[in-house]
Amino acid sequence: MVAIRGVAHFSIPVSDVARSMRFYTEVVGCRHLSTTPNGQMVFLDVAGTCLILVKRDAPINPVPDNHGGVHHAFAVAHGEYAAALEHLRAHGIEITFEEDRQGGVLNGPRVYFHDLDGTVLEFIDLTSYAGSPS
């Protein structure tokens, strides 16, 4: 078996790298690390994991309101969920779905929204995770 230590990075395709970098730093709360010289990729830090925004020339086909399918979830600090929700609203972000899910693998209140290209994102106050070491 391979000993995986964690997620090194994940990437999200975007139509406008500079515009998306502003969204992911100002709205989502990521920290800018680097931009490639040609401006086609931006590297962001998400609490120790690298998120790469990658320029796509072909149309990106989002799945609207797909909160149960492909999406990217960002854990907010415990007790900061209400402030994160207000932060989204203050930036004019439309909330597509909100719930407090309990009794599953990933538990806690969560909210779903879209980035500028329609990628589904989630903020969650992760109160428990079934995969946590005992």
Please describe what each predicted stretch is:
Residues L53, P59-V63, G92, Y129-S132:
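A short local loop/turn or secondary-structure capping micro-motif enriched for an aromatic residue
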Residues P13-I52:
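Core segments of cupin and vicinal oxygen chelate
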Residues I52-V54, L121-E122:
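Conserved beta-strand in the GNAT
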Residues A8, Q40, T49, G68-V70, ...:
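A generic structural signal for short beta-strands and their flanking turns/coil linkers
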Residues M1-A18, H72, T127-S134:
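N-terminal beta-strand motif that seeds the catalytic metal site of vicinal oxygen chelate
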Residues A3, G6-S15, D45, P62-H87, H91-S134:
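Vicinal oxygen chelate
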